[in-house]
Amino acid sequence: HLLQFNKMLKFETRKNAVPFYAFGCYCGWGGQRRPKDATDRCCFVHDCCYEKVTKCNTKWDFYRYSLKSGYITCGKGTWCKEQICECDRVAAECLRRSLSTYKNEYMFYPDSRCREPSETC
């Protein structure tokens, strides 16, 4: 669920989702072409993860998880809920690891500047 993913982002990065909204070619709604940097690659991998669970309601399905001792742990639920949670958990952790290379120049990056050939998941 988008609100849950936002909480995971805050937990991992100590930032809200705004710095990652419309970042590069993949962060935010949709995605195209080649990721611009490590942060954008996290979003690319997140999109790829969601593509593997296309039959699930990735944006709106609530799942169980906990934030304890510096870790995100996904809880039990339906197959879809567990998979969505794992996609979000892995992405939040990836975005934390990429913070040191975050480039403000890619924030609110226009889609028209995403020109390099696409990568496949």
Swiss-Prot record:
Variation of activity with pH: Optimum pH is 7.9.
Major localization class: secreted
Signal peptide per UniProt: none
Cofactor-binding details, from the entry: Binds 1 Ca(2+) ion.
Tissue: Expressed by the venom gland.
Gene3D superfamilies: Phospholipase A2 domain (1.20.90.10)
Listed cofactors: Ca(2+)
Temperature dependence: Optimum temperature is 10-30 degrees Celsius.
Secreted found in the keyword field: yes
Described purpose of this protein according to its UniProt entry: Snake venom phospholipase A2 (PLA2) that has anticoagulant activity and inhibits bactericial growth of the Gram-negative bacteria Xanthomonas axonopodis pv. passiflorae (in monomeric form). PLA2 catalyzes the calcium-dependent hydrolysis of the 2-acyl groups in 3-sn-phosphoglycerides.
An example Gene Ontology molecular-function term: phospholipid binding
Name of the protein this chain belongs to: Basic phospholipase A2 F17
Organism: Crotalus durissus terrificus (South American rattlesnake)
Disulfide bonds: C25-C114, C27-C43, C42-C94, C48-C121, C49-C87, C56-C80, C74-C85
Family: Belongs to the phospholipase A2 family. Group II subfamily. D49 sub-subfamily.
